[in-house]
Curated annotation (Swiss-Prot):
Heme 1 (or BL or b562) is low-potential and absorbs at about 562 nm, and heme 2 (or BH or b566) is high-potential and absorbs at about 566 nm. Component of the ubiquinol-cytochrome c reductase complex (complex III or cytochrome b-c1 complex) that is part of the mitochondrial respiratory chain. The b-c1 complex mediates electron transfer from ubiquinol to cytochrome c. Contributes to the generation of a proton gradient across the mitochondrial membrane that is then used for ATP synthesis. InterPro entries: Cyt_b/b6_C, Cyt_b/b6_C_sf, Cyt_b/b6_N, Cytb/b6-like_sf, Cytochrome_b, Cytochrome_b_C_euk/bac, Cytochrome_b_N_euk/bac, Di-haem_cyt_TM. It comes from Genetta genetta (Small-spotted genet). Keywords: Electron transport, Heme, Iron, Membrane, Metal-binding, Mitochondrion, Mitochondrion inner membrane, Respiratory chain, Transmembrane, Transmembrane helix, Transport, Ubiquinone. It comes from the Eukaryota. This is Cytochrome b. Heme b b566 binds at H97, H196. It is a multi-pass membrane protein. Its cofactor is heme b. One of its GO terms (molecular function) is ubiquinol-cytochrome-c reductase activity. Belongs to the cytochrome b family.
Length: 379
């Protein structure tokens, strides 16, 4: 008799994806972040659902409804802070996951990689709209500044901004539609994640050495299910430490002031996970140029497979490229720091230099280092 997990139509899909899936035997802890992203998504959907039961998307009551959740709803405070800090954990896992892909050459699976870039944009859009919902000062001014960037688009810009706002400024219509989009987008993300997995399972996972591993594969369960559970426990530990000991560590104090269109905060800045892109945006004096640089800061990931010049897929045995990769990490940390600083000397210059370096690493230095390493192989 055939095992039910191998014969039942639904169980068969789960079996082929999570149980009998042939997996390279040498994948490291860097491959844990995919499953952790799935866990983060589930946490966000569940906590978000419970928050939506008590939240009201009206400019007059949005701020009060969030306060009500924290003060009066049973365990509302923990749900709210798990959702807010869960977003930070989501982005930490996302950056680690993308970084792993760049380091080990996972971008060679172009379909999986491009769906991943689309996922990243969608997650960023969802997080941005979620930040607007509490209707604090930074929510309001963040929404105003970021949506206003679309006015840089020639000819249709102004009309587009007013269309998104639903009026002549960020107001009730904007908040209501942002709530609607923020609610529906995680389900779209879930669908895209399923497509992402579908494409990945067509080719099989990459591994640290970057070479074909068909001759040496092991079943996903129990080896990697156990490994993923360890990652999950560590993720929940860090999240709960954050939620229970310093829930406002990554937030902005200005967001505890109700939105006031007549009073601009001294420093308008987004959440920490957008600061690198925000720094790139601010480093260009021209508005349209800044918006293009902002979009390209993520879209440049799509160009990486086209600029791969090395004969080796992974950076595991490529010391020059490794140095460039860690330079990129340091550069991103610098950009994140600059994004949170006021627009004044010397931060402007540092931001411009870091932005130039960011694009140079991807477009010039990495392809050149690949060519040099190919030459070194012949020595």
């Amino acid at each position: 008799m055939t095992n039910i997990r191998k014969s039942h139509p639904l169980a068969k899909i789960i079996n082929e994806s999570f149980i009998d899936l042939p997996t390279p035997s040498n994948i490291s802890a860097w491959w844990n972040f995919g499953s952790l992203l799935g866990v983060c998504l589930i946490i966000q959907i569940l906590t978000g659902l419970f928050l939506a039961m008590h939240y009201t998307s009206d400019t007059m009551t949005a701020f009060s409804s969030v306060t009500h959740i924290c003060r009066d709803v049973n365990y509302g405070w923990i749900i709210r802070y798990m959702h807010a800090n869960g977003a930070s954990m989501f982005f930490i896992c996302l950056f680690m996951h993308v970084g792993r892909g760049v380091y080990y050459g996972s971008y060679a699976f172009t379909e999986t990689w491009n769906i991943g870039i689309l996922l990243m944009y969608t997650v960023m859009a969802t997080a941005f709209m979620g930040y607007v919902l509490p209707w604090g000062q930074m929510s309001f001014w963040g929404a105003t500044v970021i949506t206003n960037l679309l006015s840089a688009i020639p000819y249709i810009g102004t009309n587009l901004v007013e269309w998104i706002w639903g009026g002549f400024s960020v107001d009730k219509a904007t908040l209501t539609r942002f709530f609607a989009f923020h609610f529906i987008l995680p389900f779209i993300i879930s669908t895209l994640a399923a497509v992402h997995l579908l494409f990945l399972h067509e080719t099989g996972s990459n591994n640290p050495s970057g070479v074909m591993s068909d001759s040496d594969k092991i079943p996903f369960h129990p080896y990697y299910t156990i490994k993923d559970i360890l990652g999950l426990l560590l993720l929940i530990l860090v999240l709960m430490l954050l939620v229970l000991f310093s829930p406002d560590l990554l937030g902005d104090p200005d967001n505890y002031i109700p939105a006031n269109p007549l009073n601009t905060p001294p420093h308008i800045k987004p959440e920490w996970y957008f600061l690198f892109a925000y720094a790139i945006l601010r480093s260009i004096p021209n508005k349209l140029g800044g918006v293009l640089a902002l979009v390209l800061s993520i879209l440049i990931l799509a160009i990486i497979p086209l600029l791969h010049t090395s004969k080796q897929r992974s950076m595991m045995f490529r010391p020059l490229s490794q140095c460039l990769f860690w330079l990129l990490v340091a550069d991103l940390l610098t950009l994140t720091w600059i994004g949170g600083q006021p627009v004044e000397h010397p931060f402007i210059t540092i931001g411009q230099l870091a932005s130039i370096l960011y694009f140079s690493i991807f477009l010039i230095l990495m392809p050149v280092s690949g060519i040099i390493e190919n030459r070194l192989l012949k020595w």
